[in-house]
Amino acid sequence: MQMAPQMGYDRAITVFSPDGRLFQVEYAREAVKRGTTAVGIKAADGVVLLVDKRITSRLVEAESIEKIFQIDDHIGAATSGLVADARSLVDRARVEAQVNRVSYDEPIGVEVISKKICDHKQTYTQYGGVRPYGTALLIAGVDDNLPRLFETDPSGALLEYKATAIGAGRNAVVEVFEAEYRQDMNMDAAILLGMDALYRAAEGKFDASTLEVGIVSLQDKKFRKLVPEEVENYVQQILEKHKETENKE
């Protein structure tokens, strides 16, 4: 029986394949691609995070599923991939943020915390006896009156975006953003754009109970999650928009 080309190279995290690939890292990325769709958008007056929690059973309490987390007063994170891995990284980020406050008496920078998380992820691609984190994070916040949005990859790679998505619906969401995103839009418009993209990615199968929204405003530099009533208001606007479009057709 002929062995597959990657046999022997996909078992150990520290072994490169002949064409320079780390298969375990690629498999970790696949875990993210199968996760819930998370969206981040920079606006003129802040930054927005949205997640479609994709409830798979009507018996599950939607409130028990959390995909957007507060890291510090001015920083939030949205996750996709393995839930337990994400929770571990969020806890680590929170500790790093508090250590920075105690050590330097100032809030940690969004880019700094993102790099620390990526540095930690990278070590789990380099040593034997461990596996990569099967999760990606979108880290959003405000630095020096500027909105910041970073994506942390399972490999430890770090990229800053104006708008992006992770998870199962990434390609569909990014396609919407490339066509409709504007840097001068406010947070209201950014939330509506993000929800519209999630609506299209889910082919209309979403409602307020499955959506989580977090924002950081330039005005107060505080992270907060929208309450269900606020989310419902935005959802109704999206549903009405698509209903009008269908009626015209």
UniProtKB/Swiss-Prot annotation:
The formation of the proteasomal ATPase PAN-20S proteasome complex, via the docking of the C-termini of PAN into the intersubunit pockets in the alpha-rings, triggers opening of the gate for substrate entry. Interconversion between the open-gate and close-gate conformations leads to a dynamic regulation of the 20S proteasome proteolysis activity. InterPro entries: Ntn_hydrolases_N (IPR029055), Proteasome_alpha (IPR050115), Proteasome_alpha-type (IPR023332), Proteasome_asu_arc (IPR019982), Proteasome_asu_N (IPR000426), Proteasome_sua/b (IPR001353). The keyword Cytoplasm applies. Keywords: Cytoplasm, Proteasome. GO terms for molecular function: threonine-type endopeptidase activity. One of its GO terms (biological process) is ubiquitin-dependent protein catabolic process. It is found in: Cytoplasm. Pfam families: Proteasome (PF00227), Proteasome_A_N (PF10584). The 20S proteasome core is composed of 14 alpha and 14 beta subunits that assemble into four stacked heptameric rings, resulting in a barrel-shaped structure. The two inner rings, each composed of seven catalytic beta subunits, are sandwiched by two outer rings, each composed of seven alpha subunits. The catalytic chamber with the active sites is on the inside of the barrel. Has a gated structure, the ends of the cylinder being occluded by the N-termini of the alpha-subunits. Is capped at one or both ends by the proteasome regulatory ATPase, PAN. Belongs to the peptidase T1A family. This is Proteasome subunit alpha. It comes from Methanosarcina barkeri (strain Fusaro / DSM 804).
